[in-house]
């Protein structure tokens, strides 16, 4: 709401009419360009924070399984068949 009021007041000022069309367009393009850069930086910062939080939560969940190890034993063991003594 406030930016709209400021823009409206700037358009009412006599000096703003002296700019002409191309200069006003360049100013608006520069504002839009800076706005895009700021939004891109904020988006990248948010993605990095989410990724760090995800990695931290995975490390916490991996702590549950630290005591569990697979056995060094094959699934199928060979039977040791001994001949009965005669």
From Swiss-Prot:
InterPro entries: CD3_zeta/IgE_Fc_rcpt_gamma (IPR021663), FCER1G (IPR042340), Phos_immunorcpt_sig_ITAM (IPR003110). Residues 19-23 are extracellular. It is a single-pass type I membrane protein. Residues 45-86 are cytoplasmic. Keywords: Cell membrane, Disulfide bond, IgE-binding protein, Immunity, Innate immunity, Membrane, Phosphoprotein, Receptor, Signal, Transmembrane, Transmembrane helix. Residues 1-18 form the signal peptide. Expressed in leukocytes and pinealocytes. Expression in the pineal gland does not undergo circadian variations. The chain crosses the membrane at residues 24-44. GO terms for molecular function: identical protein binding; IgE binding; IgE receptor activity; IgG binding; protein heterodimerization activity; protein homodimerization activity. GO terms for cellular component: cell surface; external side of plasma membrane; Fc-epsilon receptor I complex; Fc-gamma receptor III complex; plasma membrane. Residues 54-82 form the ITAM domain. This is High affinity immunoglobulin epsilon receptor subunit gamma. It holds the Pfam family ITAM. SMART domains: ITAM (SM00077). The modification Phosphothreonine is found at residue 78. The modification Phosphotyrosine is found at residues 65, 76. IgE Fc receptor is a tetramer of an alpha chain, a beta chain, and two disulfide linked gamma chains. Associates with FCGR1A to form a functional receptor complex. The signaling subunit of immunoglobulin gamma (IgG) Fc receptor complex. As a homodimer or a heterodimer of CD247 and FCER1G, associates with the ligand binding subunit FCGR3A to form a functional receptor complex. Associates with CLEC6A. Interacts with CLEC4E. Interacts (via ITAM domain) with SYK (via SH2 domains); activates SYK, enabling integrin-mediated activation of neutrophils and macrophages. It is found in: Cell membrane. One of its GO terms (biological process) is Fc receptor mediated stimulatory signaling pathway. Adapter protein containing an immunoreceptor tyrosine-based activation motif (ITAM) that transduces activation signals from various immunoreceptors. As a component of the high-affinity immunoglobulin E (IgE) receptor, mediates allergic inflammatory signaling in mast cells. As a constitutive component of interleukin-3 receptor complex, selectively mediates interleukin 4/IL4 production by basophils priming T-cells toward effector T-helper 2 subset. Associates with pattern recognition receptors CLEC4D and CLEC4E to form a functional signaling complex in myeloid cells. Belongs to the CD3Z/FCER1G family.
